[in-house]
């Protein structure tokens, strides 16, 4: 059953990816800094990215949310504030709020994605249902290198499939360290550099992660082949100091 679900999600993701690839081919690439582009997909094509995220990566968010919730309970048992960096259309933040009751904030550079995330959280997005007003995640536009939050604002910072897009990983991780309270935790899930063609123009995060408590996980909890190897994770954690 799990294998079948993965195959179906993969096929759906490929179909959406083909549509988006045609869109990119017609309209060109985004800025070199990563603005206007998310992994070769124009962020302006918000509906296509939302569909791809839901279908291709949706099965990952359940285990990831459970892991984040466990860490949140460990570091702040009386109630944790969680920040998702690079939230996109908000699927993980919504799950953290709905299933785990966490006070969650999502940050993304693209205003269209923030609009999509807010709509999804309010129940306009297919399949989410409605959240009580007090449990709605907050979604804000901002750059990981200069976040609109005070020092020590969050107990847990999580990022999924975002770090390889950051124009300046060192600046981003320094900001995460700033907004993370003492004793807080950072969790990162990502593809290893070089797995996908567009990774060749992305900065390598290894060596640029000093200054924050960092836990780097593979692309999924199941350690699929495109996740970071154990050696790569050790190197990145060592580089983070």
Predicted feature residues:
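A short glycine-rich, Lys/Arg-flanked "PGG" loop and its adjoining helix->strand segment in the class I
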Residues: 170-182
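A short acidic, Gly/Pro-enriched loop at the edge of an enzyme's catalytic core
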Residues: 145-156
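Core SAM-dependent methyltransferase catalytic element
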Residues: 221-241
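Short alpha-helix
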Residues: 199-213
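Class I SAM-dependent methyltransferase SAM/SAH-binding core
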Residues: 83, 89-146
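A short SAM/SAH-binding and catalytic strip from SAM-dependent methyltransferases
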Residues: 156-167
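Conserved class I S-adenosyl-L-methionine
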Residues: 6, 14, 19-76, 91
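Conserved beta-strand signature within the Rossmann-like core of class I S-adenosyl-L-methionine
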Residues: 184-190
